[in-house]
Swiss-Prot record:
This is Antitoxin Rv0298. The keyword Chloroplast does not apply. Keywords: Toxin-antitoxin system. GO terms for biological process: positive regulation of growth; regulation of DNA-templated transcription. Antitoxin component of a type II toxin-antitoxin (TA) system. Upon expression in M.smegmatis neutralizes the effect of cognate toxin Rv0299. The keyword 4Fe-4S does not apply. InterPro entries: CopG.
Length: 75
């Protein structure tokens, strides 16, 4: 994968926490920040996906039907 250089300004306390977390995970600072950015991207993508698909699935109605079927069957 091609890497791009970026420049960011980060609070010193945040940077110290990132460095400690990176050491604990066996990563360097750049790897830790890249991982954090990737995780945030995936979190946002999942949030957007579920905001669009979950209502369409009407999972609450499905759960209610399953619950009622189980009660009717004596489960």
């Amino acid at each position: 994968m091609t890497k791009e250089k970026i420049s960011v300004t980060v609070d010193a306390a945040v940077l110290a926490a990132i460095d400690a977390d990176a050491r604990a995970a066996g990563l360097n600072r750049s790897e830790m920040i890249e991982q954090a950015l990737r995780n945030e991207h995936l979190r946002v993508a999942l949030r957007d996906y579920t905001a669009k698909t979950v209502p369409a699935l009407d999972i609450d109605a499905y759960a209610q039907r399953v619950y009622q079927a189980n009660r009717a069957a004596g489960s």
